[in-house]
């Protein structure tokens, strides 16, 4: 009987983890298309553009006794490989750099958040938007 209980526990633990990570409510960390905004205070317009960013679920843990042990670092969905692309803001006055660079995700991974190249905050209620009049969107993939 003990052997049967052990086997049942092993099956539940092993298949439960795989099922939870593949569920439709938890898409794994991957590149997705996102629309972002680019503007410069000195230029009269804002451009929205579509690029690829990293988004999705990364497995994490929370300690049962948080006061007794140091916190566990929580992984975030972040860039593994990326390249940079640039767009030119139209209508900028002379002497103002009209170029805006942005990252394009080629592949993603779950890892520690590095504030030097990632926004580690949670989901936003409102997407990043333009303060200036927008031009029609561009597509950069």
Curated annotation (Swiss-Prot):
One Gene Ontology biological process: G protein-coupled receptor signaling pathway
Source organism superkingdom: Eukaryota
Alphabetically ordered keywords of this record: Disulfide bond, Glycoprotein, Hormone, Secreted, Signal
PROSITE patterns: GLYCO_HORMONE_BETA_1 (PS00261), GLYCO_HORMONE_BETA_2 (PS00689)
Family (UniProt): Belongs to the glycoprotein hormones subunit beta family.
Biological role: Promotes spermatogenesis and ovulation by stimulating the testes and ovaries to synthesize steroids.
Name recorded for this polypeptide: Lutropin subunit beta
Organism: Ailuropoda melanoleuca
Lineage: Eukaryota, Metazoa, Chordata, Craniata, Vertebrata
Gene: LHB
